[in-house]
Amino acid sequence: MIRYRAAWVVPIAAPPLRDGWVDVDRGRIVAVGHDRTQAVHQEDLGAVVLMPGLVNTHTHLELSYLRQQIPPSDAFVTWVRGVMAARRSLPDAQAVEVLDAVRTGIREAVQSGTALVGDISNTLVTHAPLVESPLSAVLFYELIRFNAPDAAGLVADACARIEALEKSVHIRASLAAHAPYSVAPSVFREIRAAMEPRTHLPWSVHLAESRDETEFIGSGGGEWRTFLEQVGSWDPAWTAPGVSPVQYLDDAGFLNRRSVVVHGVQMSREDLARLSARGATLVTCPRSNAFTGAGTPPIASFYASGVPVAVGTDSLASTPDLNVFAELAAMRSLAPAVPASQLLESATLQGARALGFDAEFGSIEAGKRARLLAVTIPATVSDVEEYLVSGIEPGQLSWVGESADASRVGDS
């Protein structure tokens, strides 16, 4: 057993400890404290904050090759059209450029302090690189089909594909539906039914991301109707329900404690109350929302509603990096009154809970994996939690102990 001492320990599940320590044995946390007792084997890390590795609850690693390829937009549908055009230019999901970019994205995520990700994939191309990496993950195989005459067959095929993946103790595979404007109601219901017996797995969806989505579900018109008709995906049998996107998915039975709901930029108070009542987790990605023209997420309202809030960077197609600390800084600027402790919990324990990995990640507690992150801080810092949500650069970070050894995989 080894004891790691630090100027601060931020357990997440408890208040910060000045002059704290964490005991680790064979990769597991044994105890946390802040007294002066000495251990037989001890390492003093000095002027650092010792905290759990971060959780990036929503990203798209397979889009990493689109970094700086798509300009920002003030209209979300316009931005999506840009993504589709860029993806058509490199149709082979297994292309060397795609795989190299995925591995680079994984390496950058590890170097910026991430231990666990929720990764959305339309192709499952990221599975092998994730298995080879030090990251743990839920890989969400995402379905997009608005006109789906055989929803049951579509979902059964998707389940067969994820079941056929190489088994890994640190990578789990599940399903995602893209969004209410791009997935048929029958597909939402079939995903829910297929995932019901897989009780250890969450499912995911982009929800209430843009005003165009609200208009489409409310009236059946607008930019998404035009888009679906242009790409040949419109279903003439579909009728707009005339409700909010959140109520639409709730009525389909898609929202519960296992739902990982992404964005929520356009959610009303009623929507947030409904989401809170269902126990779903809301993942916010404010930097991506600004880039894509989706809008500004009401971060303070998210927390006030009681909805569990997690953090995602989204993809490198819409953000400059995969640094969750940078996402926290964006959240802090949008919600200056939200306690820093809550923001940090969103980037750690709430994300781990949403992904079903909270027995292993998200906090420094006895029995959990010792995926420990050391953050160098100035000696003058007195409010360590506020410092951590104000913008941390990868150069301030290092992994500790066995985590450091494992993370060297990301440097290869």
List each language-model region with its residue ranges:
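C-terminal cap of metal-dependent C-N hydrolases
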Residues: R353, R369-S412
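Divalent metal-coordination and catalytic microenvironments
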Residues: A7, V22, G27, A47, ...
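N-terminal metal-binding scaffold of metallo-dependent hydrolase/deaminase domains
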Residues: M1-Q38
